[in-house]
């Protein structure tokens, strides 16, 4: 196969070999077996680093997930047959895009199809955290509920509160739409300001300064992607700008928040609480989080619906099949965009 050919002219042989690093929904695996020479992970045990290194020696298309660290070493060790990394998921912070570009390896992701599910979960955390639902559920499960009292587990009203969204892309916009239905006032900080039409529809206020927005919000939600520019975007300094009655919700990536600084703020009562679906070193979670009653914690469930995961798999197949057929994949990710 010639190197450096444009995507439109690249055509792999029939039944190209693909390696899928995790178990996917059954309908997706069945379709992949029909279209490709597919090596599946039926036991759903994460591949070791050595197994990943072996996979890129034989696969023409690698289909990884967020749990796979496809760094420069993995990519540089790949054989010349590896032409595509078709990621199962929208986030690609676990893939070294620059190294892939240098080897003319196409990278794709699965945007759009998980927007609504992730926004739903984000809205759930926005509701659960101030209303202390996690605490209440634990009390009932542990048979500790002694009955209703006027002052038991009093949380904070959602209606009328100021919601600050960091990252007004697809998911951030979908969260804003839901938040309006609960009477929250929408504020946002984004790399680029959204259109007047979207701002008007959402009655959203744009803040050019993230620092200033943080200092005025009741709830802060992180929906921006993880990139080198957003690593520890909520640093210790920025976390200290938050009001004591502020709640933080993160359904993006754990490394966008300085987790140690967040723990310190939560322990001291400098902020009111947090709703977290992602963690900096997941699945390893700092045990301090587990003991905090003012923290709602979930195991990275953002897009975890049957419909969403099947749609993500279908998107992977479309990307891979387009490439195999010599066409430009619809969801190509370029290193320059990040």
Predicted regions and their residues:
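Rossmann-like adenosine-cofactor binding region
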Residues: 70-73, 192-288
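Conserved N-terminal Rossmann-fold NAD(P)-binding element of oxidoreductases
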Residues: 21, 164-166
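C-terminal helix-to-coil terminal segments
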Residues: 2-16, 108-121, 148, 154, ...
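Phosphate/diphosphate ligand-binding glycine-rich loop within oxidoreductases
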Residues: 59-141, 155
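N-terminal glycine-/charge-rich "phosphate-binding" loop or analogous flexible N-terminal tail
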Residues: 1-59, 183, 324
